[in-house]
Swiss-Prot record:
It comes from Rattus norvegicus. GO terms for molecular function: phosphate transmembrane transporter activity; sodium:phosphate symporter activity; virus receptor activity. It comes from the Eukaryota. Homodimer. It holds the Pfam family PHO4. This is Sodium-dependent phosphate transporter 2.
Length: 656
């Protein structure tokens, strides 16, 4: 059959396919390196470079098998034998519908499934062109089932692996020995899965024809050699590196303790003067001095304990963008107090949230008077956002009455600084960063005692019998120790590369599957598409994916890597390995699972195991809703384009 008259459709298909690959790169590649960027093991630029290499390689070696399912597994192409041009128009419509919806989703920073898009678009044009009989509904049922199986399976595998790692490594007093012993096993598992995937799926491309037992044996042998190399060279090097890091941290800790001792009697930077006091007045007494004197007069309390404990907790519990003159952390109370009794801290004007923060402050201007048991003893979780600074803003109206001691003056001569009662009210200032709340609000309580003032931050110095959240426990859940960070640092990079490789093999078919069908129909003049998928078309799709990643990828990386749950190198390694293993297995059997579902399932499972409050369930709900919306929306776009092409070009429906 002469196809020269439809060359314009092929050219249009190549252009749209590149746009579709661009949208896949902008949206779905965040699944691969989002957690690595979120945990801080790689920068965004490094992630883009590594993803470009492994996405392209994976698309060439693994993309052909899944592409066959996308091309011929969803609709019955034999029904288009008499109207080949209708099928070609349908492939163009499918690419348009999928590309439009993915670009919209990327603009809105919604992580959606590229597989869902192309499946929905394919069904959409088929319903217009040939009616319900053109869809292989049983195949669609299997695909829909895989959308639920993949996050559950990936989440289960990630959860089990993380529990084992936490049990044998993370919770140990000294995690280094067990971690070093497990390193060869972790590397071997990663390499074995990767080699098996390449040999099993990419063997035809490499000109190899091996039985599965031979491929498994080769994969096991390569993994064993790699494990021996890690045990012989990497483990001793890692042990020396960890020892050096711990020695440096010990020296810094000793220096920090010495600095704190020197400033124990100095003026605290939290409150340089109490509200209402004048600079020239004798009543402007440093808070730490008052606390120390009060502590000295109290039973069973040493004179130096309170100020140091209070100030130390302030340093350890707050995280923001300003530098403290004393602490070696990222935030210290380097604010200043005004006469309204509030402590103010600087928010960078270029952070992109300056106006929004001012609006929030204006909205929250009215005081919230709540019972102490509801307001106190809370530390809002910090969720680092990719596009903003995390600010620590204390809204602390201070009302304190000072009564001089009996030896200094009479009670009637004591100066009333602010009021006759002690009250504490709190404003919770929160601001949106797209889909996340980025908060780190330190709470403070100023209370008057006989002979002085005691400062307490959050719930650190309160009654231990009072039921409240333990911020220290939350902090343990969110951070790896220095040695654990080093152990899993490169492992997460390796597994991220592995995940990118698997993503390229699975998702390039979403962009190139319809183009491959269009090209083979044009070259062969029929709908059978018996020829193998051309490698250069897979490479073309890989280039489009990488372009989308570099231009727009950072928009969705934020959601997967930072907003859904806090990521550490240990949890990131678990998420990457288990989800990538699920995707590769699915790719090898030709099942077009969603990498988004696998990664989201792993992220949520590990985050829930670490802490139920660590997962942004609101964001997860939105992602879950998007899974159901994508298929019909992409199908509607595709159906509309197909109806338009059939009307303009006069194509005849194959159902007639």
């Amino acid at each position: 059959m002469a196809m020269d008259g439809y060359l314009w459709m092929v050219i249009l298909g190549f252009i749209i396919a590149f746009i579709l690959a661009f949208s896949v790169g902008a949206n779905d590649v965040a699944n691969s390196f989002g957690t690595a960027v979120g945990s801080g093991v790689v920068t965004l630029r490094q992630a883009c470079i590594l993803a470009s290499i492994f996405e392209t390689t994976g698309s060439v070696l693994l993309g052909a098998k899944v592409g066959e399912t996308i091309r011929k597994g969803i609709i019955d192409v034999n029904l288009y034998n008499e109207t080949v041009e209708t099928l070609m128009a349908g492939e163009v419509s499918a690419m348009v519908g999928s590309a439009v919806w993915q670009l919209i989703a990327s603009f809105l920073r919604l992580p959606i499934s590229g597989t869902h898009c192309i499946v929905g678009s394919t069904i959409g044009f088929s319903l217009v062109a040939i009616g319900p009989k053109g869809v292989q509904w049983m195949e669609l049922v299997k695909i829909v089932a895989s959308w639920f199986i993949s996050p559950l399976l990936s989440g289960f595998m990630s959860g089990v692996l993380f529990i084992l790692i936490r049990m044998f490594i993370l919770t140990k007093e000294d995690p280094v020995p067990n971690g070093l012993q497990a390193l060869p096993l972790f590397y071997a598992a990663t390499i074995a899965i990767n080699v098996f995937s390449i040999m099993y799926t990419g063997a035809p491309v490499l000109g190899l024809s091996l039985p599965i037992w031979a491929i498994a044996l080769i994969s096991f042998g390569v993994a064993l050699l790699f494990a021996f190399f890690v045990w012989l060279f990497v483990c001793p090097w890692m042990k020396r590196k960890i020892a050096g890091r711990l020695e440096k941290e010990s020296a810094l800790s000793r220096a920090s303790d010495e600095s704190l001792r020197k400033v124990q009697e100095a003026e605290s930077p939290v409150f340089k003067e109490l509200p209402g006091a004048k600079a020239s007045d004798d009543s402007a007494v440093p808070l730490t001095s008052l606390a120390g004197e009060a502590a000295g007069a109290s039973e069973g309390t040493s004179a130096g304990n309170h100020p140091r404990a209070s100030y130390g907790r302030a340093l350890s519990m707050t995280h923001g963008s300003a530098k403290s003159p004393i602490s070696n952390g990222t935030f210290g109370f380097e604010g200043h107090m005004r006469n309204d009794g509030h402590v103010y801290h600087t928010v960078h004007k270029d952070s992109g949230l300056y106006k929004d923060l001012l609006h929030k402050i204006h909205v929250d201007k009215g005081p919230e008077e709540k019972p102490a048991q509801e307001n106190n003893y809370r530390l809002l979780r910090r969720n680092n956002s990719y596009t903003c600074y995390t600010a620590a803003i204390c809204g602390m109206p201070v009302h304190a009455t000072f009564r001089a001691s009996d030896t200094s003056s009479a009670p009637e001569d004591s100066e009333k600084l602010v009021g006759d009662t002690v009250s504490y009210s709190k404003k919770r200032l929160r601001y949106d960063s797209y889909s996340s709340y980025c908060n780190a609000v330190a709470e403070a309580e100023i209370e008057a005692e006989e002979g002085g003032v005691e400062m307490r931050l959050a719930s650190e110095l309160t009654d231990p019998d009072q039921p409240h959240e333990d911020p220290a426990e939350d902090e343990k859940e969110e951070k790896d120790s220095a040695e654990v960070h080093l152990l899993f640092h490169f492992l997460q990079v390796l597994t991220a590369c592995f995940g990118s490789f698997a993503h390229g093999g699975n998702d390039v078919s979403n962009a190139i599957g319809p183009l491959v069908a269009l090209w083979l129909i044009y070259k062969q003049g029929g709908v059978t598409q018996e020829a193998a998928t051309p490698v250069w078309l897979l490479f073309y799709g890989g280039v489009g994916i990488c372009t989308g990643l570099w231009v727009w990828g950072r928009r969705v990386i934020q959601t997967m890597g930072k907003d859904l749950t806090p990521i550490t190198p240990s949890s990131g390694f678990t998420i990457e390995l288990a989800s990538a293993f699920t995707v590769v297995i699915a790719s090898n059997i030709g099942l077009p699972v969603s990498t988004t579902h696998c990664k989201v399932g792993s992220v949520v499972a590990v985050g829930w195991i670490r802490s139920r409050k660590a997962v942004d369930w609101r964001l997860f709900r939105n992602i879950f809703i998007a899974w159901f919306v994508t298929v019909p929306v992409a199908g509607l776009f595709s159906a509309a384009i197909m109806a338009l092409l059939m009307y303009i070009c006069g194509f005849v429906s194959s159902s007639r």
